[in-house]
């Protein structure tokens, strides 16, 4: 009886799996797809073993007796009287020969039933298993499915917009110099609706009061941080301007020397996605004026400039498509270029990741700061804000017109804010801070890093002398002198190994700046209609403490990946991992970075604006941005601007006619022929025309997946459930047939 008890115990333990082998409480990590597949497979095995025991161990009696599920003749396996005390078979010569026919012959209908059920069930299960394995095989080695919005969004499947197949699109737009408090119902109505989560466009929206940039809060360091996930001290672009002593070369905007850009072991997002999916999905990235994306590494490899201890630079380090910087480009042309990428007519040529850079607000801010309503340049400033807002609105409308929003995610960010500087009142002159002889004897290079000064010395042994001379020459309430390696810990800027770092830095408080005499003269000659009788005027700058109010940046995510709600402020080093996640890049294929996972954790539980508690200097924010700033309304408790308060400033009247034309333009009018590195037909087909695009992905299926179709994960789960039900139904049917026959 011991063996029978053991088998019954096992049967009881597995019993629950028979009803629902895929129940949710069996999966403990709902965000780990690899664990999910493993758990699903484990459930399937348990379910199969459970039912196989039932198939092979139904109650049997010898000879012509009938089986009974609760009768006294219920037996399992070898008859117990054939075993000795140790469980070993005994001599069967004394046993009736008819009894030995148990389960071995076909003279009884009952054994035939058992054998048929076992073989047929096993066959069906084997077919199902092969199907499951083929379907479950991901496009890439390890899949990531951690979307937080629509359960129908899957980065690995193809969608259909009604005319063409698409892989999911991810578009990143960076608004240089755009502070989140610039958003208002009056000046940026579209961004206002996004920021308040009230945009009625059928897309989920996630936002945050502000995103924290990296120090120094300058354009090139922060744009490289956004796409690498690394602090500037780690990725090596430590400022907009610096000296590279190894190359004996100065870096500044416009320098495209690959030896500087590839100096550290960094990997921008376009390299990550193009490498991770190489050979599986024809994943391509396109960048439009993104800082650092137009570096040509071909010459670097051909001339063997790469150090011997490093491998040649991968071709994926350059985006498949990239556009060089053009400061004079109108926003209508920028929109046209982005839509050209979207409108490419085949999967093989269309990029799945597009990054665009919008410099307009930053360019204005450097000239005049952020003018308040009573200041001279306010109307010009609001016009600039309105143009940027309209650009974003028409970009989203272009996606909607093309029926792309159910599988397109848009990420809107900025790199930093802006601080107003009253000139010359709040400026100190570099030449007045250090004796001319000391500058000549000790200083090799002195660069203006925005409002800061970075000083490289000829001999590190002179650091203390120069440091103390500077400290005695400045107002330490407004300016702080730092020796490299002694920056505040929260800046994440201490690393003695980075050779791009200057020896000594002078960092002002927001609203103050260090300038050279020559620079001050140049600035004073600019167009400053706000200059008073004392020749005092306002400019703007950035580069300060990244936690300063003036330096805050924007983050808004919209699309099927995102949930609806707010998240707490976070560091911009999280954006790289966010983009990897949206695109479906597994963690093992991501480059090492400084992201903490904080953003991903928050996306799991978005909050309301009331739940995101913000303690802030709202008096200062009102004085700088006005009480009707959307930020002040949401988190400062200030009243909404009423129609009476609001001067009619409808941005539709300010729309660029060309931009309107492009947004409404059918994609058939946007065709492009580009030089490709692979054999791809030219884009002469129009997106809305009659075409028969072929599938070129590594998935064997050419079936068009509609934009509202279930994801691969949901589809597979349905197949598993259906197969399980099918097997159960077949077995029950066989039971009924055999029972009726007997």
From Swiss-Prot:
Keyword annotations for this protein? Glycoprotein, Hydrolase, Membrane, Multifunctional enzyme, Phosphoprotein, Signal-anchor, Transmembrane, Transmembrane helix
Q: So which domain of life are we looking at?
A: Eukaryota
Q: Which organism is it from?
A: Saccharomyces cerevisiae (strain ATCC 204508 / S288c)
For this entry, the protein name equals Ectonucleotide pyrophosphatase/phosphodiesterase 1
Q: What else is known?
A: Present with 3420 molecules/cell in log phase SD medium.
Q: Catalysed reaction(s)?
A: Hydrolytically removes 5'-nucleotides successively from the 3'-hydroxy termini of 3'-hydroxy-terminated oligonucleotides; a ribonucleoside 5'-triphosphate + H2O = a ribonucleoside 5'-phosphate + diphosphate + H(+); a 2'-deoxyribonucleoside 5'-triphosphate + H2O = a 2'-deoxyribonucleoside 5'-phosphate + diphosphate + H(+)
The similarity comment for this entry is: Belongs to the nucleotide pyrophosphatase/phosphodiesterase family.
Cite the record's Low complexity compositional bias ranges: 691-711
Q: Which residues lie on this side of the membrane: Extracellular?
A: 135-742
Tell what triggers its expression.
Answer: Up-regulated during phosphate starvation.
């Amino acid at each position: 009886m011991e063996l029978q008890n053991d088998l019954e115990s096992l049967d009881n333990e597995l019993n629950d799996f028979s009803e629902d082998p895929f129940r949710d409480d069996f999966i403990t990590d709902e965000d780990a797809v690899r664990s999910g597949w493993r758990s699903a497979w484990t459930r399937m095995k348990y379910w199969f073993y459970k039912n196989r025991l039932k198939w092979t161990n139904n109650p049997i009696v010898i000879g012509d007796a009938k089986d009974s599920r609760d009768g006294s003749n219920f037996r399992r396996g070898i008859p117990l009287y054939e075993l000795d005390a140790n469980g070993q078979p005994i001599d069967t010569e004394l046993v009736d020969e008819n009894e030995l026919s148990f389960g071995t012959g076909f003279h009884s209908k009952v054994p035939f039933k058992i054998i048929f059920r076992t073989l047929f069930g096993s066959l069906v299960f084997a077919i199902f298993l092969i199907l499951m394995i083929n379907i479950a095989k991901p496009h890439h080695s390890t899949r990531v499915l951690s979307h937080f919005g629509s359960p129908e969004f899957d980065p690995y499947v193809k969608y259909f917009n009604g005319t063409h197949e698409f892989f999911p699109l991810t578009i990143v737009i960076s608004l240089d110099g755009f502070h989140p408090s610039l958003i208002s119902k009056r000046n940026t109505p579209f961004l206002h609706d996004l920021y308040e989560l009230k945009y009625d466009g059928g897309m989920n929206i996630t936002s945050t009061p502000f995103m924290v940039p990296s120090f120094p809060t300058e354009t090139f360091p922060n744009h490289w941080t956004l796409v690498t996930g690394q602090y500037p001290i780690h990725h090596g672009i430590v400022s907009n301007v610096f000296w590279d002593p190894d190359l004996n070369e100065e870096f500044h905007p416009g320098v495209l020397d690959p030896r500087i850009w590839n100096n550290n072991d960094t990997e921008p997002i376009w390299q990550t996605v193009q490498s991770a999916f190489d050979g599986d999905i024809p994943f391509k990235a396109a960048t439009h004026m993104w800082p650092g994306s137009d570096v040509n590494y071909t010459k670097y490899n051909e001339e063997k400039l790469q150090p011997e201890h490093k491998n040649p630079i991968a071709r994926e380090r350059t985006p498949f498509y990239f556009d060089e910087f053009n400061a004079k480009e109108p926003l209508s042309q920028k929109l046209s270029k982005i839509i050209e990428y979207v409108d490419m007519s085949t999967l093989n040529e269309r990029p799945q990741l597009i990054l665009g850079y919008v410099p307009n607000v930053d360019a204005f801010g450097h000239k005049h700061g952020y003018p308040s309503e009573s200041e001279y340049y306010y109307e010009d400033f609001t016009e600039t804000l309105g143009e940027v807002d309209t650009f974003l609105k028409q970009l989203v409308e272009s996606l909607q017109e093309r029926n792309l929003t159910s599988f397109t995610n848009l990420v809107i960010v900025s790199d930093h804010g802006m601080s107003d500087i009253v000139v010359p009142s709040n400026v100190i002159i570099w030449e007045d801070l250090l004796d001319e002889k000391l500058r000549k004897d000790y200083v090799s290079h002195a660069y203006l890093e925005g409002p800061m000064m970075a000083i490289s010395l000829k001999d590190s042994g002179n650091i203390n002398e120069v440091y103390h001379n500077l400290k005695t020459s400045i107002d330490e309430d407004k300016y702080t002198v730092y020796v490299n390696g002694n920056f505040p810990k929260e800046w994440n800027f201490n690393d003695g190994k980075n050779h791009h770092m200057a020896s000594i830095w002078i960092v002002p408080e927001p609203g103050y700046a260090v300038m050279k005499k020559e620079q001050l003269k140049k600035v004073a000659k600019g167009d400053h209609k706000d200059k008073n009788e004392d020749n005092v005027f306002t400019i703007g700058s950035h580069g300060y403490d990244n936690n300063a109010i003036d330096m805050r940046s924007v983050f808004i995510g919209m699309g099927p990946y995102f949930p609806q709600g707010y998240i707490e402020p976070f560091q911009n080093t999280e954006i790289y991992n966010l983009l990897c996640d949206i695109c479906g890049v597994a963690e093992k294929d991501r480059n090492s970075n400084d992201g903490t996972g904080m953003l991903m954790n928050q996306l799991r539980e978005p909050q309301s604006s009331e739940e995101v508690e913000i303690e802030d200097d709202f008096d200062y924010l009102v004085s700088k941005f006005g009480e009707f700033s959307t930020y002040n309304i949401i988190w400062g408790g200030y009243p909404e601007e009423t129609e009476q308060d609001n001067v009619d400033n409808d941005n539709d009247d300010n729309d660029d006619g060309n931009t309107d034309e492009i947004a409404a333009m059918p994609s058939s009018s946007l065709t492009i022929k580009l030089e490709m590195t692979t054999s791809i037909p030219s884009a002469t087909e129009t997106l809305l025309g009659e075409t028969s695009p072929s599938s070129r992905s590594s998935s064997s299926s050419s079936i068009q997946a509609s934009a509202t179709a279930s994801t691969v994960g949901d589809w597979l789960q349905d197949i598993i459930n259906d197969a399980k039900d099918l097997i159960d139904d077949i077995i029950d049917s066989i039971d009924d047939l055999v029972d009726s026959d007997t």
